[in-house]
């Protein structure tokens, strides 16, 4: 058991180090570059009246932005999460934590996930891999994760390709949907289903909605490729070649977003995967997202200082607001109907 716990910590340390130092982006792009807004040269709007506010999980947000789940479980992760949470609170946006599975076997890692004291008002998301439900994790333990960090929702992430490209990954994905349904019915907060960089299809979305999922995080191809991360972690040529061969795998963020919005007009959609700016975020909202998530550039900033994270978030918000003014959009509802090139 101790060896397994140490392996979990080493893996998390590897993931942070590789993401910070290597180019692990998918060779696919998010697809959002193909969306072209029609510029409005006479918007008839006062910039100071532009409203980027929204609600998520019953909480007010100053902007429709989620700091996507990244890390936890290590000393370095503790500092990163703390800085991200401080910046999220200051900016009035949401934050997801990295996978918390390690907390179930190594309780002393709680301090690396505990951020509610510095971010009392934000939508805060707990997180664990859905496949862990096939390896003994129970709905009660999922509730424990929520209670421990005072989360507003639980992310169950679907990371099948990532698991299959790491030597210690989980292989059994059989009969997982009924277990997801059990968790949904048991928990005191909503369940968010999130991919990790390969997108959600229409068929998968329909299954998840049928069992009661109300929020989906697309996490499409275009950003971090976790198979490429594992290629850097590989201990031998075979592992490296297997992982590297999937660098261009997945459904792009734009394709996934369009498919899922066709499935349901009511479900809350988070667009993430390769978004780099507030302009990308505006495009995602125009194409059907309720909020948008970013990770990579915020991770790099958070490894240095909270002030850099806050600066990056303010840049993204400013880009969003300028895009709104230049499309004649005073609110996010207006932005969702802004004119685009067809």
From Swiss-Prot:
GO terms for biological process: isoprenoid biosynthetic process. It is an enzyme of class 5 (isomerase). The keyword Ribosomal protein does not apply. Its cofactor is FMN; NADPH; Mg(2+). GO terms for cellular component: cytoplasm. Mg(2+) binds at residue 163. Its main location: cytoplasm. Keywords: Cytoplasm, Flavoprotein, FMN, Isomerase, Isoprene biosynthesis, Magnesium, Metal-binding, NADP. InterPro entries: Aldolase_TIM, FMN-dep_DH, IPdP_isomerase. GO terms for molecular function: FMN binding; isopentenyl-diphosphate delta-isomerase activity; magnesium ion binding; NADPH binding; oxidoreductase activity. CDD domains: IDI-2_FMN. It is found in: Cytoplasm. Its EC number is 5.3.3.2. It catalyses: isopentenyl diphosphate = dimethylallyl diphosphate. It comes from the Bacteria. FMN binds at residues 68-71, 99, 127, 194, 224, 295-296. Substrate binds at residues 11-12, 99-101. Homooctamer. Dimer of tetramers. Involved in the biosynthesis of isoprenoids. Catalyzes the 1,3-allylic rearrangement of the homoallylic substrate isopentenyl (IPP) to its allylic isomer, dimethylallyl diphosphate (DMAPP). Belongs to the IPP isomerase type 2 family. HAMAP family: Idi_2 (MF_00354). This is Isopentenyl-diphosphate delta-isomerase. It comes from Rickettsia typhi (strain ATCC VR-144 / Wilmington). The lineage of its organism: Bacteria, Pseudomonadati, Pseudomonadota, Alphaproteobacteria, Rickettsiales. The gene is fni.
């Amino acid at each position: 058991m101790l060896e397994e716990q140490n392996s979990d910590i080493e893996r998390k340390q590897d993931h942070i180090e590789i993401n910070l130092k290597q180019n692990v982006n998918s060779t696919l792009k998010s697809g959002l570059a193909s969306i072209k807004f029609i510029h409005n040269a006479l918007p008839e709007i006062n910039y100071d009246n532009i409203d980027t506010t929204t609600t998520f999980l019953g909480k007010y947000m100053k902007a429709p932005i989620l700091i996507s789940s990244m890390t936890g479980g290590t000393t370095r992760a503790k500092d990163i999460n703390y800085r991200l949470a401080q910046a999220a609170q200051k900016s009035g946006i949401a934050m997801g934590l990295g996978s918390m599975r390690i907390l179930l076997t190594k309780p002393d890692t709680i301090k690396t996930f505990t951020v509610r004291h510095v971010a009392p008002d934000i939508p805060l998301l707990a997180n664990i891999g859905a496949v862990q439900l096939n390896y003994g994790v129970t709905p009660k333990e999922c509730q424990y994760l929520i209670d421990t960090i005072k989360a507003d929702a639980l992310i169950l992430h679907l990371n099948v390709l990532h698991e299959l490209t790491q030597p210690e990954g989980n292989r059994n994905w059989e009969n997982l949907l009924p277990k997801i349904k059990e968790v949904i019915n048991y928990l005191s907060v909503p369940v968010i289903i999130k991919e990790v960089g390969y997108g959600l299809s229409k068929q998968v979305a329909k299954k998840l909605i049928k069992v009661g999922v109300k929020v989906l995080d697309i996490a499409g191809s275009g950003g971090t490729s976790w198979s490429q991360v594992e290629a850097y972690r590989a201990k031998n040529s075979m592992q490296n070649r297997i992982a590297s061969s999937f660098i261009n795998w997945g459904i792009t963020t734009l394709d996934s977003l369009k498919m899922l919005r066709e499935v349901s007009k009511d479900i809350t959609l988070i667009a993430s995967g390769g978004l780099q700016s507030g302009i990308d975020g505006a495009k995602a909202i125009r194409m059907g997202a309720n909020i948008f998530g970013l990770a990579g550039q915020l991770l790099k900033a958070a490894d240095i200082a909270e002030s850099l994270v806050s600066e990056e978030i303010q840049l993204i918000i400013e880009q969003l607001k300028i895009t709104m003014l230049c499309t004649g959009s005073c609110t996010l509802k207006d932005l969702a109907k802004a004119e685009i090139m067809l």
